[in-house]
């Protein structure tokens, strides 16, 4: 059976480190990191997620700021708030919780965030820096950054020569994940819905990353023996065994089957999920260090 990669434990390590480095920054007479979270509307899942981000920011010793705006907020009003946050030296990270209401252009909002405060890593400048290997000053999207940390906990920092297959080509996970693996000297293939003979391709992977949003699509016999499997998917499926109308969370990988083949695998829940908020804190801390003229910490 595969080693189970405990994302919750690694995320707790990251948060502990962020907390300690925040205390060091303040001890040097610098301002504590500031994270501003902006939420528009009353989507219940977004509310829960934002509350968790704000709570973790406070735990890290950050200055935590939250703007909760009504669903009818205009694009112009939201852009004004972002401009104010861009100009505020007490704010190092700005995060706009997605999705936004239909009348607001999410792309326009994200590109309005100052790149040095774009701790989600979605601004074109940060995307470009990641794509060209400028990792010293880039902010990497939190889910792939967290996934990479989990891979390195198993495989070490140097991944030279390993074959990596990323299933999924989204701008939020698939593409940045592939760029991170390239930067670590992997041989990388990106697969997607049009890929021919995906099972055969997946079997070549020493590192297999699943980020397609299809429940248990990747079967056990798609996994190379000893591979490291990172399951980014979070899917809710019916669970009649729990009672009528009940559901359960599964990933994009058929976990029980894959765990018999893999060398190491992330569970769902408890794998990649906890890493996302932890890496948001790491990015905010890095922004504060860079703003103070200090070398950013690495994780």
From Swiss-Prot:
**Known pathway:** One-carbon metabolism; tetrahydrofolate interconversion
SUPFAM superfamilies in UniProt: Aminoacid dehydrogenase-like, N-terminal domain, NAD(P)-binding Rossmann-fold domains
Q: Which Pfam families match?
A: THF_DHG_CYH, THF_DHG_CYH_C
Reply yes or no: does the keyword Oxidoreductase apply: yes
An example GO CC term for this entry is: cytosol
Q: Does the keyword Oxidoreductase apply?
A: yes
Amino acids binding NADP(+): 168-170, 193, 234
- InterPro entries in alphabetical order: Aminoacid_DH-like_N_sf, NAD(P)-bd_dom_sf, THF_DH/CycHdrlase, THF_DH/CycHdrlase_cat_dom, THF_DH/CycHdrlase_CS, THF_DH/CycHdrlase_NAD-bd_dom
Catalytic activity of the protein? (6R)-5,10-methylene-5,6,7,8-tetrahydrofolate + NADP(+) = (6R)-5,10-methenyltetrahydrofolate + NADPH; (6R)-5,10-methenyltetrahydrofolate + H2O = (6R)-10-formyltetrahydrofolate + H(+)
Which EC number(s) does the record attach to this protein? 1.5.1.5, 3.5.4.9
GO: which molecular function terms? Answer: methenyltetrahydrofolate cyclohydrolase activity; methylenetetrahydrofolate dehydrogenase (NADP+) activity
Source species, domain of life: Bacteria
Described function: Catalyzes the oxidation of 5,10-methylenetetrahydrofolate to 5,10-methenyltetrahydrofolate and then the hydrolysis of 5,10-methenyltetrahydrofolate to 10-formyltetrahydrofolate.
Among PANTHER family, the record links this protein to: C-1-TETRAHYDROFOLATE SYNTHASE, CYTOPLASMIC, C-1-TETRAHYDROFOLATE SYNTHASE, CYTOPLASMIC-RELATED
For this protein, the record's HAMAP family field holds:
THF_DHG_CYH
Q: How does it assemble?
A: Homodimer.
Q: What is this protein called?
A: Bifunctional protein FolD 1
**Source organism per UniProt:** Mesorhizobium japonicum (strain LMG 29417 / CECT 9101 / MAFF 303099)
The encoding gene is folD1
């Amino acid at each position: 059976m595969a080693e189970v990669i405990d994302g919750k434990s690694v995320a707790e390590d990251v948060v502990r480190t962020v907390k300690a480095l925040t205390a060091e920054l303040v001890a040097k007479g610098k301002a504590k990191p500031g994270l501003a979270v902006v939420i528009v509307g009353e989507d219940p899942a977004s509310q829960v997620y934002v509350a968790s981000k704000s709570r973790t920011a406070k735990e890290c010793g950050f200055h935590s700021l939250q703007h909760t705006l009504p669903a009818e907020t205009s694009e112009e009003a939201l852009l004004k708030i972002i401009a104010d946050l861009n100009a505020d030296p007490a704010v190092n990270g700005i995060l706009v919780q997605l999705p936004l209401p239909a009348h607001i252009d999410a792309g326009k909002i994200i590109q309005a965030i100052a790149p040095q405060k774009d701790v989600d890593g979605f601004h074109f400048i940060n995307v470009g820096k990641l794509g060209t290997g400028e990792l010293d000053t880039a902010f990497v999207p939190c889910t792939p950054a967290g996934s990479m940390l989990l891979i390195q906990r198993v495989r070490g920092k140097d991944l030279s020569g390993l074959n990596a297959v990323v299933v999924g080509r989204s701008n939020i996970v698939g593409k940045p994940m592939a760029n991170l693996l390239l930067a670590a000297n992997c041989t990388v293939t990106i697969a997607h819905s049009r890929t021919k003979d995906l099972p055969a391709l997946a079997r070549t992977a020493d590192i297999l990353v699943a980020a397609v949003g299809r429940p248990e699509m990747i079967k056990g016999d798609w996994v190379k023996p000893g591979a490291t499997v990172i399951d980014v998917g979070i899917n809710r499926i019916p669970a009649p065994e729990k009672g009528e109308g009940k559901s359960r969370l599964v990933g994009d990988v058929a976990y029980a089957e894959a765990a018999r083949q893999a060398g190491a695998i992330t569970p769902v829940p408890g794998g990649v999920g906890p890493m996302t908020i932890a890496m948001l804190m790491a990015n905010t801390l890095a922004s504060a260090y860079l703003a103070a003229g200090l070398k950013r910490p690495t994780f």
